Regions:
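Short, small-residue-enriched loops and turns at beta-alpha junctions
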Residues: 33-34, 66, 72-75, 104-106, ...
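Active-site-adjacent C-terminal substructures of enzyme catalytic domains
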Residues: 133-136, 140-180
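Divalent metal-dependent hydrolysis catalytic cores, especially in the metallo-beta-lactamase
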Residues: 11-40, 53-66, 92-106, 120-122, ...
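Extended, charged catalytic domains and RNA/DNA-binding interfaces, predominantly
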Residues: 87, 96-103, 108-130, 134-152
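Conserved phosphate-binding/catalytic loop of the ribokinase/pfkB sugar-kinase fold
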Residues: 65-90
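Charged helix-capping and loop-helix junction motifs
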Residues: 8-9, 40-43, 81-83, 157-163
């Protein structure tokens, strides 16, 4: 779930998760204008100060491939940009724990390095990366796949893509468990 409605909405969503057995969560924020994302990040920081079940923030965007964007607004997607990332990390006050990146984009691998250097999990997702680009991202320190098999090329014997690269690297595969 994405928590873009500010601290009150985040608190309500975390309470709903708690009622269903979730003991800890990352507040996931989706692609928006950078200023709006900074505002949302600050709202998540405020909510986390009041609730120890909020373990941090996951930025699922805006550094995503347009061709694999899913529900993300294509007009808000950005090329990987270290200065924009730094704004987000500064607003997160140490709570940004994970950022999803499409590593095949120009600057994508550099963003993976910047995330790893900042102690933030770099996740590969909403990406059209082939095996080589994905493997390079995992070699650079990316260690998670954002909702495996969704928003990426399918696993194919002639084009193994992100999933095979992640398995070769021992990366964590996050899945959407709707209906489970």
């Amino acid at each position: 779930a994405s928590y873009d409605g500010g601290a009150e909405a985040i608190a309500a969503a975390v309470a709903a998760h708690r009622r269903h057995g979730t003991t800890g969560t990352l507040v996931s924020l989706i692609t928006a204008d950078p200023d709006d994302m900074v505002t949302a990040i600050r709202g998540a920081v405020a909510a986390a100060g009041d609730d120890p079940r909020i373990l941090g923030i996951h930025l699922e965007g805006p550094f995503l491939a347009e061709s694999r964007r899913g529900a993300h607004d294509p007009g808000k997607l950005l090329a990987p940009d270290g200065a924009v990332l730094q704004r987000f990390l500064d607003a997160g006050a140490g709570l940004v724990r994970m950022v999803t990146v499409a590593p095949e984009l120009p600057g994508g691998l550099g963003l993976v390095h910047a995330l790893v250097d900042a102690g933030v999990h770099a996740a590969v997702g909403h990406s059209d990366a082939g095996y080589r680009d994905a493997a390079a991202a995992f070699a650079a320190g990316a260690d998670i796949v954002t909702h495996a098999f969704n928003g990426m090329r399918p696993l194919h014997h002639r084009d193994p893509g992100i999933i095979a690269a992640a398995m070769d690297a021992g990366a964590l595969l996050e899945v959407i468990n709707d209906g489970v």
